[in-house]
Every structure is written in structure tokens, then in C-alpha cells.
């Protein structure tokens, strides 16, 4: 798929701010600092479209990116970040839950996990939500350049066992090496 146009449509903090058109939405979910913004910038070939930071918690609203005027890529705030107030965590959880439960246009989930880390309880909750809703999702193992090939293969095997998914539902991704970009674009193409 060729990315022709990318527009930062809006950052929403409540349901009234979501786009009102009926374009399909692909949502990106994962823990804080897992590489969601980096994946967006790499796959869309835009250097600073999504703001990145080495400090977790950079994305606070629900960010909507309009791709080729055909679909939205939706970047949710990361979960699991310990260094914010309980009130802020509660607000983020509420915003994520509200979006996931009210969006009528959600078509696919890109579920990001750092290839070096084990899934958390929050990761299991999120995967189970997608399964419960019968929504297609793909697990994207990020930061693959940080491990060798055998560690990468083992991580994929482990994720498939843990989440009870097929190998085709997992993408190994590295922004540094541009690994996995074409597979993510193939998912986009289904909704363009």
C-alpha cells in the first residue's frame, strides 16, 4: 500500500470529540513506551507525526490520523505507566475503555508488545477484549533490533502459546531496520 496523504485529524479526550464520519478505524494499543508513536512515524514514513519520547506517557489523548482519506489510524494512550497520578491513570483507562466500547468503526487492532518483555495482566485484558468482541487483531513485537534471531523466534513462539494465536497474527517490528513495515501496510490495505 502506498501512503499518499496523512493528516493528524484530532486528539480526543472524550466521546464527543471522536470523528463523526464512518471511516474504518485501526487502533494501536500497548503499554507506555512500547513504541506506538515510533511505529506510526515509521510505517507512515513521517518523521515527527506522532510525538515520541524516551519518557513514558507522552500520548495522553486518543490521537486520530487520517490516512489517504480512507481510514483512521487511532493511537491510544499507553497503559501501565507507574509515574502518573492515580487520577490520571483512571482517566486514561476510562478514555481507552470508552473508545473501545463505543467505536462503531473499529476494524482491526495492532497490539504492541516489547519483544524483550513478558505480557502483563493489562496485556491479557486487552487481548481478551479483542477476542471477546471478535475483532481481528495482530500482535506487533516491537524493538526487534534489540534481540538476536533465535530470541526473536522464541518470543514469537511464546506469544503464540500465551495468547493462543497463530504465527500469521504476529509481526516482528523494528523501526531501526524497517522490519515489519510491509506487513503493517498490508493490514492497512484491507481497509483503504
Curated annotation (Swiss-Prot):
<feature type="binding site">
    <location>
        <begin position="142"/>
        <end position="145"/>
    </location>
    <ligand>
        <name>GTP</name>
    </ligand>
</feature>
<dbReference type="GO" id="GO:0000917">
    <property type="term" value="P:division septum assembly"/>
</dbReference>
<keyword id="KW-0717">Septation</keyword>
<feature type="binding site">
    <location>
        <begin position="30"/>
        <end position="37"/>
    </location>
    <ligand>
        <name>GTP</name>
    </ligand>
</feature>
<keyword id="KW-0547">Nucleotide-binding</keyword>
<dbReference type="GO" id="GO:0005525">
    <property type="term" value="F:GTP binding"/>
</dbReference>
<keyword id="KW-0131">Cell cycle</keyword>
<dbReference type="InterPro" id="IPR027417">
    <property type="entry name" value="P-loop_NTPase"/>
</dbReference>
<dbReference type="InterPro" id="IPR005225">
    <property type="entry name" value="Small_GTP-bd"/>
</dbReference>
<dbReference type="InterPro" id="IPR019987">
    <property type="entry name" value="GTP-bd_ribosome_bio_YsxC"/>
</dbReference>
<feature type="binding site">
    <location>
        <position position="37"/>
    </location>
    <ligand>
        <name>Mg(2+)</name>
    </ligand>
</feature>
<dbReference type="GO" id="GO:0046872">
    <property type="term" value="F:metal ion binding"/>
</dbReference>
<keyword id="KW-0342">GTP-binding</keyword>
<protein>
    <recommendedName>
        <fullName>Probable GTP-binding protein EngB</fullName>
    </recommendedName>
</protein>
<feature type="binding site">
    <location>
        <begin position="57"/>
        <end position="61"/>
    </location>
    <ligand>
        <name>GTP</name>
    </ligand>
</feature>
<keyword id="KW-0460">Magnesium</keyword>
<feature type="binding site">
    <location>
        <begin position="173"/>
        <end position="175"/>
    </location>
    <ligand>
        <name>GTP</name>
    </ligand>
</feature>
<keyword id="KW-0479">Metal-binding</keyword>
<feature type="binding site">
    <location>
        <begin position="75"/>
        <end position="78"/>
    </location>
    <ligand>
        <name>GTP</name>
    </ligand>
</feature>
<dbReference type="Pfam" id="PF01926">
    <property type="entry name" value="MMR_HSR1"/>
</dbReference>
<dbReference type="GO" id="GO:0005829">
    <property type="term" value="C:cytosol"/>
</dbReference>
<dbReference type="InterPro" id="IPR006073">
    <property type="entry name" value="GTP-bd"/>
</dbReference>
<keyword id="KW-0132">Cell division</keyword>
<feature type="binding site">
    <location>
        <position position="59"/>
    </location>
    <ligand>
        <name>Mg(2+)</name>
    </ligand>
</feature>
<dbReference type="InterPro" id="IPR030393">
    <property type="entry name" value="G_ENGB_dom"/>
</dbReference>
<feature type="domain" description="EngB-type G">
    <location>
        <begin position="22"/>
        <end position="192"/>
    </location>
</feature>
<comment type="similarity">
    <text>Belongs to the TRAFAC class TrmE-Era-EngA-EngB-Septin-like GTPase superfamily. EngB GTPase family.</text>
</comment>
<comment type="function">
    <text>Necessary for normal cell division and for the maintenance of normal septation.</text>
</comment>
